[in-house]
Amino acid sequence: MGDDRRQRIVDGRTTLGIELGSTRIKACLVDEDLVPIAAGSHEWENEYVDGRWTYSLEAVETGLRAAYAALVADVEAQYGVTPTTYRAVGVSAMMHGYLAFDAAGELLVPFRTWRNTSTGPAAERLSEALGFNIPLRWSIAHLYQAVLDDEPHVAEIAGVTTLAGYVHRRLTGGNVLGVGDASGMFPIEGGPVDSGPGDPGAKDFDHAMLATAQDLIGVPDLRSLLPEVLVAGAEAGELTPEGAAWLDPTGTLEPGAPLCPPEGDAGTGMVATNAVAPRTGNVSVGTSIFAMVVLEQPLTTAHEELDVVTTPAGDAVAMVHCNNGASEIAGWARVFGRFAEASSERTGATPIGIDDVYATLLAEAVADDTDPDAGGLLSFNYLAGEPVTHVEDGRPLLLRTPGARFTLGNLVRSEVHGAFATLAIGMDVLHGEQVQVDRMTAHGGLFRTPGSPQRLLAAALRVPIALEETAGEGGAWGIAVLAAYLEHTDQQLADYLSDTVFGGDAVHVAEPEPADVTGFQTYLDRYRAALPVQDVAAAATRPSATTGPTEETDGADPRLQTEEVTR
């Protein structure tokens, strides 16, 4: 096998995927069977500058080069050869946000990431005018907010794109976006994709909504500011000499490899979990948390709790996105991990690792003496604002009444319930729309501990929750699969994934247990009733507040860093 893979690498018959997550940039190399054979990564952090979360373009360049160099080093260590070209290449990144450039291609203001929630007036006016929910983090909301705030750079804007779009342009010279990533900038036209064997079809931004938004925002040609939209399987350019040198300044990487359309991390998460067909969905749990369900029919009305995006093939997807995920669980794990470490130091016992800490805590969450409703405890994981529940400035809180059963099991169950509560509120809207879901696939570092997280998520969402072996490979693997799909457009993407890529069944499916469902609903009722406490807590602590997680919290737990490849 080693000799065969070595020859495939030499011949350029491998496929490269790179994804820029919020805490890690990962490069993944797969063989012709789409099996990962090498990887490289680079840790990075967003910066909080002048009231906004950002990454510098210098950090993007440095991080990409470091991740790619680490992959090359891994290939050299394993196989004794250096890759010079690839069968195909794909790039993906965290969605949304705002990268505005002038006519010379110069960045006008620092990159505004999806974490920024200062676009409330713009998002509200756009949503009302379009009859379509425009979330705070969408690119069009950032653009309009800049107009409303009379920012000087607006007059110089020649183009707006996403992080994946920017990187793809540096590699190929093309100003394009995959439809999934584009759907986080501005709404995509409805209806089925007109495609056939060898022809992936086409999608574009909704033209009627573009006209309405253009009048509202007051720009002369809104469409010209946005990238060309491409569906999965469409040709999206090839690696240029300049692009090859930008990614690999050693000069070893040769130009010419084809690239697939750049995608967002939501789309690569769908691919990594085999969830691009109607009635399927996936849940990603990391520092943020989101669920996506592929729709059979359009929603009957706009809902502020739901984003409507698309799969990489252009099919409509309802997304519930929550800014806050498992970071509070990670925080408690660090506390109890340090307790275990200190106890070991004091007694001379063998110390335990973080995975054992998680396993012990999460087992307590479903122990026989743990209450299904967490015994009266209540946990808010709001390290940042939370648009789904209309919390502008969040505070992590643990609440309990004097009569609550304050046990370890109830504490952990409350924290897990709290991590899933905002997601469940959004999913309740989907249930009200009569959206049918056969199964959802979960992925993220939290699910490295088998059993209780999967079981409690099934109860919270009231749907079966599956785990796929490939879900842990992350978005870099997902975009590599999309790059490989360039040669398989004789099949629909959903068929390609089901028949060629996956083939087997999920490792395990957890069905919702009635007692867990009832317990979670009781917990959720208390959670909704206590939401006003957030405003009080924020008002009392605002002098030292920020609008997002601190860097120590955001990147402290490798279990969450692993997931953030597929935010």
Each model region followed by its residue ranges:
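Conserved phosphate-binding catalytic cores of ATP/NTP-utilizing and phosphoryl-transfer enzymes
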Residues: 2-11, 77-80, 142-149, 241-251, ...
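Short acidic, glycine/serine/threonine-rich loops at helix termini
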Residues: 99-103, 171-175, 181-182, 189-192, ...
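Acidic, glycine-rich loop-and-beta core segments that form the ion-binding/anion-interacting portion
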Residues: 262-302, 306-310
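Glycine/Thr-rich phosphate-binding loops that ligate phosphate moieties of nucleotide
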Residues: 1-41, 48, 84-124, 233, ...
